[in-house]
């Protein structure tokens, strides 16, 4: 028999053999291919690979049908039968007994843990091939004691389609990689479990529990219907919280003022060392048994998001003088909670968080309390004054989680709240010149009660007749009452469009006209129900000649120069700087007189660089400073100084030769 031909034929048969799937799940392990020496050992009967019954049957079928290699088959079969028995292995069979299977070919093996190598396949030399005979001869071998359970067939052994598992210790890199994979798997499982629990809780919370009424009387059906309606109404209730100023509980109206701006929140002007009453109302679910109310004062930049700023501790600090003279505790707190039925605990930490917390009784839906501020905006540093101050309330559960909140967008602690509030309102509305009285109202026909003590005159000709004005009083009473009647000659603008200089000076060259006005002495700050006293007087529209008008302009120009010099000396200007304003002067000089140099950028944005530009701008816009956007607290100074400047310039233009 030709051995080379026989080997080649056997190789062809082995390559054409179908691969029988193994019973084990094998990962990508490192495998080694058998070389030519292993084939020679198999043919010579010196080496018998482990084969499954199916592989043996298929191999026997092909070998018996192939002429010339019966000797090879007999050699393999004889070697398989004479294989030494491994007595120390388990007697458990990995496959059930099949019909027609030879009992002497059944082998029992045990499964052992395998170390899987995830690396790429490595090619090994012929000398590194595994010799199973050497392993079987050494019974004390560790590899033999921990037998490899494998149902690898002959074709899988020779063709390299089945990876071989080896028992060895993991390297440090492999162990770290395996530990990392286990941690990632645990984290993924934990996240999946949390998502499932969250979805399950949402499903139970959103589930509508409906009552199915049983067959009963009409009264019981009504009870079930009422229960269903009650549960549906409870679910429709929305959770809300409001934080408002209780003006009715104020001791004085001048202590504070607040303005609710549409789409811009609440603005509050409050006086220092005065009680400001507040009320907080809310509606939350009944599942929260223990609630906490927190009041926090925050100082934040106008460019920041207020929703984020109120949740971050502010760096607001009370000034040193007020902190040293403070009697309440803690001394460094900017405000305190007084006149409240709840117990408030301050939380003033190292981060200067201005916060007070109250533990509420179960079932509480509103809280009344007063706040007293012990420092004001003018005490702060320049960097702190540029920020905005707001007051926020938070409703929290027993775990400190926020449920609802509300905020007063801007809080201003000032000396005169009503004055600053009016300036704020004037900035939003149409501004009027300060020299025009807002209380003077012209009436063409005055109808007064004749039975009244102060009855109006029946005609303009009888305005000076005091005997008709006070008919039912004595002589002394008439004299005393007549002293209260004032005849005022004021310049009132006509209905026609006036020129710009005339509107500034408050006069118009028209004919003399006589009319009456009635001025009410109303005290807006008083809550008295007394009837306001009316005063009747004379009102005139004056017509001036050219000479009189020149004197009039010169008088106001001189007065304007004196007022401008006062502004200059008040702001400590050097002698080199002139105490007057000229059209060629830069706008910075005008702002230095007012004391608001930081507003120069607003003027430059509108193209105003000199006083001449500002004069032309006023001829287009009456409310120029509101359009520019200056500080409302300094609005009166702006208009007053510009009025004096324009009167001086009008005198210069009027006296120039035509």
From Swiss-Prot:
One Pfam family this sequence matches: CEP1-DNA_bind
Residues binding Zn(2+), per UniProt: 319, 322, 375, 379
Free-text comment on the cofactor: Binds 1 zinc ion per subunit.
Obligatory cofactor(s): Zn(2+)
Ranges of biased composition (kind: Low complexity): 466-476
Induction statement: By DNA damage.
Region listing for Disordered, in residue ranges: 450-477
Family affiliation: Belongs to the p53 family.
Protein name, as recorded: Transcription factor cep-1
């Amino acid at each position: 028999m030709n051995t080379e031909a026989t080997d080649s034929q056997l190789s062809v048969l082995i390559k054409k053999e179908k691969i029988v799937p193994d019973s084990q799940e094998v990962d990508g392990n490192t495998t080694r291919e058998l070389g030519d020496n292993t084939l020679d050992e198999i043919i010579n009967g010196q080496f018998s690979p482990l084969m499954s019954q199916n592989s043996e049957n298929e191999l026997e079928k092909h070998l018996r049908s192939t002429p010339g290699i019966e000797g090879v088959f007999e050699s393999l079969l004889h070697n398989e039968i004479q294989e030494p028995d491994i007595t120390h292995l388990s007697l458990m069979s990995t496959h059930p007994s099949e019909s027609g299977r030879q009992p002497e070919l059944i082998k029992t093996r045990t499964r052992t843990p395998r170390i899987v190598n995830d690396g790429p396949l490595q090619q090994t030399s012929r000398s590194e091939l595994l010799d199973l005979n050497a392993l079987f001869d050494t019974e004390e071998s560790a590899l033999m004691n921990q037998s490899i359970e494998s149902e690898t067939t002959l074709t899988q052994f020779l063709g390299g389609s089945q990876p071989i598992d080896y028992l060895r210790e993991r390297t440090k890199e492999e162990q770290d990689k395996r530990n990392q994979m286990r941690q990632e798997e645990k984290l993924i499982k934990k996240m999946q479990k949390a998502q499932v629990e969250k979805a399950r809780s949402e499903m139970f919370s959103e589930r509508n529990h409906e009552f199915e009424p049983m067959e009963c009387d009409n009264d019981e059906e009504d009870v079930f219907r009422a229960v269903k309606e009650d549960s549906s109404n409870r679910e429709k209730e929305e959770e809300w919280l409001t934080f408002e100023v209780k003006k009715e509980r104020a001791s004085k109206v001048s202590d504070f003022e607040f303005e609710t701006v549409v789409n811009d929140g609440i603005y509050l002007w409050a006086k220092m060392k005065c009680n400001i009453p507040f009320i907080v109302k809310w509606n939350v679910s009944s599942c929260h048994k223990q609630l906490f109310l927190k009041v926090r004062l925050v100082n934040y930049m106008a460019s920041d998001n207020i929703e984020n700023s109120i949740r971050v501790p502010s760096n607001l600090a009370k000034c040193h003088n007020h902190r040293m003279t403070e009697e309440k505790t803690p001394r460094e707190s900017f405000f305190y909670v007084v006149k409240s039925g709840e117990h408030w605990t301050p939380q003033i930490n190292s981060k200067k968080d201005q916060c007070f917390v109250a533990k509420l009784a179960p079932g509480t839906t509103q809280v009344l309390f007063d706040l007293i501020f012990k420092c004001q905006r003018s005490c702060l540093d320049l960097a702190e004054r540029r920020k905005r101050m707001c007051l926020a309330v938070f409703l929290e559960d027993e775990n400190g989680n926020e449920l609802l909140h509300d905020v007063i967008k801007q809080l201003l602690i000032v000396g005169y709240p009503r004055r600053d509030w009016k300036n704020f309102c004037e900035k939003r509305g149409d501004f009027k010149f300060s020299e025009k009285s807002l209380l003077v109202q012209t009436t063409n026909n005055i109808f007064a009660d004749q039975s009244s003590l102060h009855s109006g005159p029946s005609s303009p000709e009888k305005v000076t007749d005091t005997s008709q004005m006070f008919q039912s009083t004595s002589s002394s009473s008439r004299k005393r009452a007549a002293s209260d009647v004032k005849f005022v000659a004021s310049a009132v603008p006509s209905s026609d469009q006036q020129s710009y200089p005339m509107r500034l000076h408050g006069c118009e060259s028209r004919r003399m006209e006589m009319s009456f006005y009635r001025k009410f002495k109303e005290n807006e700050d008083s809550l008295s129900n007394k009837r306001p006293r009316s005063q009747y007087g004379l009102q005139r529209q004056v017509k001036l000649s050219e000479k009189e008008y020149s004197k009039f302009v010169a008088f106001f120009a001189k007065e304007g120069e004196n007022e401008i010099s006062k502004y200059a000396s008040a702001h400590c200007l050097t002698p080199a700087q002139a105490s007057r304003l000229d059209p060629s002067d830069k706008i910075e000089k005008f702002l230095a007189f007012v004391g608001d140099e930081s507003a120069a950028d607003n003027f430059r944005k509108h193209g105003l660089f000199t006083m001449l530009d500002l004069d032309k701008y006023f001829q287009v816009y009456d409310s120029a400073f509101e359009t520019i956007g200056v500080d409302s607290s300094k609005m009166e100074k702006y208009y007053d100084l510009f009025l004096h400047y324009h009167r001086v310039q009008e005198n210069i233009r009027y006296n120039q030769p035509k």
